[in-house]
Amino acid sequence: MKRTFQPNNRKRAKVHGFRARMKTKNGRNVLARRRLKGRHSLTVSGEK
C-alpha cells in the first residue's frame, strides 16, 4: 500500500504557502493567529 505522505515541494507551497493563505478570508485569519501567537514561521513557503 502506498504511504499517505508523498513529498512534493510544489504541491506543499500551492496548498500551504503564503500566497495560498492570502487568497481566502480564513487563510488570512490563519496568518493573523500565527502572528499573534508569535510563530517563528508563518507558512511553509515562509521567510528564507
UniProtKB/Swiss-Prot annotation:
<keyword id="KW-0689">Ribosomal protein</keyword>
<dbReference type="GO" id="GO:0003735">
    <property type="term" value="F:structural constituent of ribosome"/>
</dbReference>
<dbReference type="GO" id="GO:0006412">
    <property type="term" value="P:translation"/>
</dbReference>
<protein>
    <recommendedName>
        <fullName>Large ribosomal subunit protein bL34</fullName>
    </recommendedName>
</protein>
<dbReference type="GO" id="GO:0005840">
    <property type="term" value="C:ribosome"/>
</dbReference>
<dbReference type="GO" id="GO:1990904">
    <property type="term" value="C:ribonucleoprotein complex"/>
</dbReference>
<dbReference type="InterPro" id="IPR000271">
    <property type="entry name" value="Ribosomal_bL34"/>
</dbReference>
<dbReference type="InterPro" id="IPR020939">
    <property type="entry name" value="Ribosomal_bL34_CS"/>
</dbReference>
<dbReference type="Pfam" id="PF00468">
    <property type="entry name" value="Ribosomal_L34"/>
</dbReference>
<comment type="similarity">
    <text>Belongs to the bacterial ribosomal protein bL34 family.</text>
</comment>
<keyword id="KW-0687">Ribonucleoprotein</keyword>
